[in-house]
Curated annotation (Swiss-Prot):
Location in or out of the cell: Cell inner membrane
Gene Ontology, cellular component aspect: plasma membrane; proton-transporting ATP synthase complex
Protein name from the UniProt record: ATP synthase epsilon chain
Pfam family, one: ATP-synt_DE_N
PANTHER family linked: ATP SYNTHASE DELTA/EPSILON CHAIN, ATP SYNTHASE EPSILON CHAIN, CHLOROPLASTIC
CDD domains tied to this protein: F1-ATPase_delta
Intrachain disulfide bonds: none
Keyword field contains Translocase: no
GO MF term list: ATP binding; proton-transporting ATP synthase activity, rotational mechanism
């Protein structure tokens, strides 16, 4: 059994991460899950949420936006629409997005076509703010 997981995280635009890590945690469609070396193979969808990995005793946090997570032979492949490291998130921009989404939702009912879109924008903004709060930047 390997002592590390090889993780590749990519978006349609670029490779965000290619590291050997001790463990990784993400938010799947059925809830949060963690993977350690030696985990059984599986494939799941991801929802808007936080992805955290541990490397050398330190935790790193990213905000991710929908995608897929696959484990096979101690290799983890994460394909997501977007991913931002905690220290790359513009907190003011996330707060502004939250305000816009909240304002838009006030004028909509759940039956409106754009309700789900605005609800997702709200969720993305909240996750980005949560993850930004875990940044190691000074």
């Amino acid at each position: 059994m390997a002592e590390k997981l090889k993780v590749d995280l990519v978006t349609p635009y670029k490779k965000i991460l290619s590291e050997e890590v001790d463990e990784i945690t993400a938010t799947g469609a059925l809830g949060e899950f963690s993977v350690l070396p030696g985990h059984a193979p599986f494939l799941t969808s991801l929802k808007i949420g936080e992805l955290t990995y541990k490397k050398g005793g330190q935790f790193f946090h990213l905000a991710v936006n929908w995608g897929y997570f696959e484990v096979e032979d101690d290799k983890v492949t994460v394909l997501v629409e977007t991913a931002e490291r905690a220290d790359e998130i513009d907190l003011e921009r996330a707060k502004a997005a939250l305000g816009r989404a909240e304002a838009a939702l006030k004028g909509l009912s759940p039956e409106d076509k754009s309700y789900k879109t605005q609800e997702a924008a709200l969720e993305r903004a909240l996750i980005r703010m949560q993850v930004a709060g875990k940044s190691t930047r000074k």
